[in-house]
UniProtKB/Swiss-Prot annotation:
GO terms for molecular function: phosphoric diester hydrolase activity. CDD domains: GDPD_Rv2277c_like. Residues 31-300 form the GP-PDE domain. Keywords: Signal. This is Uncharacterized protein Rv2277c. GO terms for biological process: lipid metabolic process.
């Protein structure tokens, strides 16, 4: 019995690729190209420099990572420690916005194939969320990935900026943290993407037992990696068995599950190649999240 279970499980996950390759195009429109952290491969991520270059490369949407300063101002920054990307150190919420904007967000940025750190002599400040919004076209969709706990100070500050700038209607709030997603969902005036936990559960239910459950949430965005390394664990009386799988959980059936009777929009994360983009188009994804807008601008041709 354990042997049959393991084989069936691998087929259910691994077989997705072969099925998807044979599918007809799922939609006539190209998927939106969304710049991940404003184009983290091309320029220092989450900076106005990256935003303006991603816009020039023709992206359709902007994915920005947001935390809040000690004085309550939302800024763009992803890691938990400023030392990861900048010439500073410590958490974002340990410094005022004025202190944060004196740091160089490109301090540790490197370009593949180029020696050194090209932005150490060219300061690229950490922008506020308001500055970032001002650098995008007024009709561009923004995806705001909230990366800081406790959630409420960040959620409230983001809501205030979106209201003040008039950008709430074109902004989707997202987080991998369930508490942040819940807090954002309670905040008046915010459009919030589906919880990653719910998205992941529905995708695995579709892959493993072909059930579209939990029920899709009408009108929301949902996202997950186009390819995802996962570990499947099976428990036995005398221990456990583990299988490592590179899963393609998005396929035509899962996309249809999310959209069926709900109008959900779906995004594939970590789309890195033209073949990934073609697969996303084939199965009908609404958008793809890319690290290099400069590379992605060629995929549509």
């Amino acid at each position: 019995m354990p042997g049959r279970f393991t084989v069936a499980l691998v087929i259910a996950l691994g077989g997705t690729c072969g099925v998807a390759d044979a599918l007809p195009l799922g939609q006539t429109d190209d998927p939106m190209i969304v710049a991940h952290r404003a184009g983290t491969r091309d320029f220092p991520e989450n900076t106005v420099l990256a935003i303006t270059n991603a816009v020039a490369a023709g992206v359709d949407g902007m994915w920005l990572t947001v935390q809040v300063s000690s004085d309550g101002v939302p800024v763009l920054y992803r890691p938990s420690d400023l030392a990861t990307l900048t010439d500073g150190a410590g958490p974002v919420n340990s410094k005022t916005v004025q202190q944060l904007q004196q740091l160089n967000a490109g301090w540790n940025f490197t370009t593949p194939g180029v020696e050194g750190h090209p932005y150490r002599q060219r300061a690229t400040p950490i922008p506020t969320l308001e500055q970032a919004i001002g650098a995008t076209p007024p009709d561009m969709t923004l995806f705001l990935d909230l990366k800081q706990t406790p959630p409420q100070p960040l959620v409230s500050a983001v809501a205030q900026v979106l209201t003040r700038t008039g950008a709430a209607g074109r902004s989707i709030v997202y987080s991998t943290n369930a508490d942040i997603t819940a807090a954002a969902s309670r905040q008046e005036g915010l459009q919030v993407a589906e919880s990653r936990d719910v998205t992941r559960q529905r995708l695995f239910n579709m892959a493993l037992n072909h059930h579209c459950d939990p029920q899709p949430d009408p009108g929301k965005w949902a996202g997950f990696e186009l390819h995802r390394d996962v570990t499947v664990t099976e428990e036995f009386t005398l221990g456990s068995g583990i299988s490592a799988v590179n899963a393609e959980l998005w396929d035509e059936a899962s996309v249809d599950c999310f959209r069926s009777q709900s109008g959900m929009k779906v995004m594939g994360f970590a789309v890195k190649t033209v073949d990934d983009y073609r697969l996303a188009h084939k199965i009908g994804l609404d958008a793809v999240l890319v690290d290099s807008p400069l590379a992605a601008q060629q995929w549509r041709h």
